[in-house]
């Protein structure tokens, strides 16, 4: 649970620091974790991409980890999603989505909401960000509890949660893993744990996930 809470603990630290600044004096708002290394031209290339593209709302590079002495792509997500450790927002976009949420799934909630408002989430593949991993850690492996809580706090309905849970269970070919995810999700619902998103935002997120599901399985 501590590891899961740490996922959005960086958001709390970011918001605490942001409150000390007058955002009116900035055009770009960045959230960077302390365990990453940026290239010397990273910030300039981010600024240039915003300046040249008025519809860019969120921009970032690709995350790399050291493996056997080489830096390789940390393939824990698709290459069109800006990962949590290295977010750069156009200020107007950041304010429109209401900032970041201190909850599991925050780094997907922001992307879905900004795209719904017409902004683009852009990954610049030429920008390599080095993640300093804890020795022996494998960030691609997550427990069932993580997924159950993640789907709940993302605001997903039961149908989409069960579909997503089945997808994760199939990856490791475990029916028990599916049962564990669903059990955790249902426990969160029964406890009526507080969500950091509004009812309207839940609808937006569910519609987004439903559209992805339809496009993949029905080609509609």
Feature locations, PLM:
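Non-catalytic, C-terminal membrane-associated alpha-helical segments of glycosyltransferases
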Residues: 143-220
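Active-site-proximal specificity loops/subdomain of glycosyltransferases
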Residues: 1-26
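Conserved donor NDP-sugar-binding/catalytic core segment of glycosyltransferases
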Residues: 37-73
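Short, high-confidence coil segments that cap the C-terminus of an alpha-helix
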Residues: 26, 53-56, 119
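Short beta-strand-to-loop acidic/aromatic patch adjacent to the donor-nucleotide binding site
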Residues: 25-37
């Amino acid at each position: 649970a501590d590891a899961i809470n740490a996922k959005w603990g960086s958001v709390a630290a970011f918001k605490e620091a942001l409150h000390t600044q007058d955002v009116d004096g900035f055009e770009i708002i960045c959230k960077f974790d302390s365990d990453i290394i940026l290239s010397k031209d990273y910030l300039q290339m981010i600024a240039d991409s915003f300046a040249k593209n008025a519809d860019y709302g969120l921009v970032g590079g690709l995350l790399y980890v050291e493996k056997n002495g080489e830096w390789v792509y940390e393939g824990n997500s698709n290459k069109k999603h800006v990962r949590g450790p290295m977010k750069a927002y156009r200020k107007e976009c950041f304010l429109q989505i209401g900032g970041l949420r201190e909850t599991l799934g925050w780094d997907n909630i922001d992307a879905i909401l900004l795209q719904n408002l017409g902004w683009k989430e852009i990954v610049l593949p030429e920008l390599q960000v080095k993640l300093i991993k804890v020795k022996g850690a494998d960030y691609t492996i997550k427990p069932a509890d993580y997924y159950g809580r993640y789907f709940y706090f993302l605001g997903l309905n039961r149908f989409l949660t069960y579909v997503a849970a089945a997808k994760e269970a199939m990856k490791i070919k475990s029916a028990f893993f599916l049962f564990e995810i669903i059990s955790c999700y249902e426990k969160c619902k029964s406890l009526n744990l507080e969500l950091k998103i509004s009812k309207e935002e839940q609808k937006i997120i569910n519609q987004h996930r439903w559209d992805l599901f339809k496009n993949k399985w029905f080609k509609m």
